[in-house]
């Protein structure tokens, strides 16, 4: 799970041919405001991102533009370099979660998760162009796949405000 630090209001800019957030490499749709279901949830301008820099998301991610732009930087500076030419490159990011109005780790009484503000995305793995699947659950800390995941995680730690991986808790 990666999440951004809170920031003041942000502007959503729609680009040409399905681009969002003013970045032609981020494809998706603007979905507008998401009303708060409970106090602390919701976001002013949500986007539903379907691909970033040519890499498809397994399911579109509902996030804010700051998160989308940070995710794009991570794809370019972390994910793609970590994978390199292995398997022909990255075809897909497996998204396990994005916007959801819920408490942290779905624990009753906990603070609202960054997911509830559109500032977090859970990534469970990647699929390479040759069909190879690398998952956090199966491959973390194991062989070349584990090295790829560790490199991806390290760059995410530099890009996002909060990054939770397998060492964080049983939920990640």
Where are the model-predicted features located?
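Short acidic, glycine/proline-rich loop/turn micro-motifs
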Residues: 60-62, 105-107, 136-139
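Residues that form or immediately flank small-molecule/cofactor binding pockets and catalytic motifs
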Residues: 54, 97-98, 141
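Active-site-adjacent substructure of cysteine-protease-like catalytic cores
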Residues: 84-118
């Amino acid at each position: 799970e990666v999440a951004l630090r809170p920031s003041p209001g942000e502007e959503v800019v729609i680009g040409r041919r399905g681009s969002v957030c003013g970045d032609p490499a981020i494809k998706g749709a603007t979905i507008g405001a998401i009303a708060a279901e409970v106090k602390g949830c919701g976001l002013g301008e949500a986007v539903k991102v379907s691909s970033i820099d040519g890499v498809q998301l397994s399911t579109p991610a509902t996030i804010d533009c700051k998160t989308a732009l940070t995710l794009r930087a991570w794809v370019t500076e972390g994910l793609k370099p970590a994978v390199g030419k292995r398997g022909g490159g990255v075809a897909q990011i497996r998204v396990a979660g994005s916007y959801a109005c819920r408490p942290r780790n779905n624990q009753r009484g906990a603070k609202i998760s960054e997911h509830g503000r559109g500032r977090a995305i859970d990534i469970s793995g990647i699929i390479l162009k040759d069909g190879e699947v690398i998952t956090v659950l199966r491959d973390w800390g194991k062989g070349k796949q584990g090295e790829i995941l560790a490199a991806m995680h390290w760059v995410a730690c530099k890009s996002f405000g909060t990054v939770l991986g397998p060492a964080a808790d049983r939920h990640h």
